[in-house]
Amino acid sequence: MISSRCKNIKPSAIREIFNLATSDCINLGIGEPDFDTPKHIIEAAKRALDEGKTHYSPNNGIPELREEISNKLKDDYNLDVDKDNIIVTCGASEALMLSIMTLIDRGDEVLIPNPSFVSYFSLTEFAEGKIKNIDLDENFNIDLEKVKESITKKTKLIIFNSPSNPTGKVYDKETIKGLAEIAEDYNLIIVSDEVYDKIIYDKKHYSPMQFTDRCILINGFSKTYAMTGWRIGYLAVSDELNKELDLINNMIKIHQYSFACATTFAQYGALAALRGSQKCVEDMVREFKMRRDLIYNGLKDIFKVNKPDGAFYIFPDVSEYGDGVEVAKKLIENKVLCVPGVAFGENGANYIRFSYATKYEDIEKALGIIKEIFE
């Protein structure tokens, strides 16, 4: 009785690894901030509850939040996106699903960097699309000429993520502009996952939407404001792309029959996040940077590893000691939880992903264990 569509979806390898862990493991696997949601955001949601804001919101989200998202895009990236071209979603994950399900038919090709966040692959398969990998070099760079060579008449989307999960790579202006030009030249659409746009240490974030209208910009509140459980994200499209495809109305058709709307009182929390002081974000990023430096310095003499530019992941090559699954299992046996790189695509088979979104002291303990095993 189970549909073939469901049967074809593989369980998350990340969750499978977590199931092997015991409660006394040092968790360097989880991809969420260990900080609590800032108090002013919580208080705003409480006020919304007290004021009876517990009913359905408009399908595309409360107007005040969409207006504030529009302001953010203007202030941060000089993008002019009308609030009516924004949908507030149940996390950025729903925004990804809406983008793929709205645009991909059976057999349509989707270009995805490999390794990448696992959902890009699974959602493409769910839509019965065909995955075409964009291979990365040892520094996780994208070869734009190889991207062009991968394009056929069936290619419709490029899914792109900067800062990257799992690599921590922040792509430079030239790469992002180059992808935008490819989208223009080949009539493709870029689905740009920008959920880590504020968690950057040494570089600057650029959005493909700064260089092309053929972009769906996806973001959320989970990573920036430590709001993973709130499930609030959004997508934004240019007026030109929306006029061409009536994209917002088509996405709303899927959204209204699956989720109806994002949780109303949580939307008021997100509104407070954007309107309030951003010091909480600056403080979290400062702490993440300290942890990044700690874990990079601890791993660089053991594994071949690139220093992350953003997000809160580091992705070392462990092939000197075995493949990623073997090394991850050995670490779990020694009470350090990580994720084998193959969970993010076959090109990650020789890697493991550590998250440093955990306490500084726990990272120090984990590094001590790692050194005992591999040095």
Curated annotation (Swiss-Prot):
Top-level taxon of the source organism: Archaea
InterPro entries (alphabetical): Aminotransferase_I/II_large, AspAT/PAT-like, NHTrfase_class1_PyrdxlP-BS, PyrdxlP-dep_Trfase, PyrdxlP-dep_Trfase_major, PyrdxlP-dep_Trfase_small
Catalyzed chemical reaction(s): L-aspartate + 2-oxoglutarate = oxaloacetate + L-glutamate
UniProt entry tagged with the keyword Transferase: yes
Cofactor(s) this protein requires: pyridoxal 5'-phosphate
Binding site for L-aspartate: G31, N165, R353
Compartments, as annotated in UniProt: Cytoplasm
Any single Gene Ontology cellular-component annotation: cytoplasm
Transferase keyword on record: yes
GO BP annotations listed: amino acid metabolic process; biosynthetic process
N6-(pyridoxal phosphate)lysine modified-residue sites: K223
Enzyme class: transferase
Listed transmembrane segments: none
Main location: cytoplasm
GO molecular function, one term: pyridoxal phosphate binding
Family, as annotated: Belongs to the class-I pyridoxal-phosphate-dependent aminotransferase family.
Designated name of the protein: Probable aspartate aminotransferase
Species this chain originates from: Methanocaldococcus jannaschii (strain ATCC 43067 / DSM 2661 / JAL-1 / JCM 10045 / NBRC 100440)
Organism taxonomic ancestry: Archaea, Methanobacteriati, Methanobacteriota, Methanomada group, Methanococci
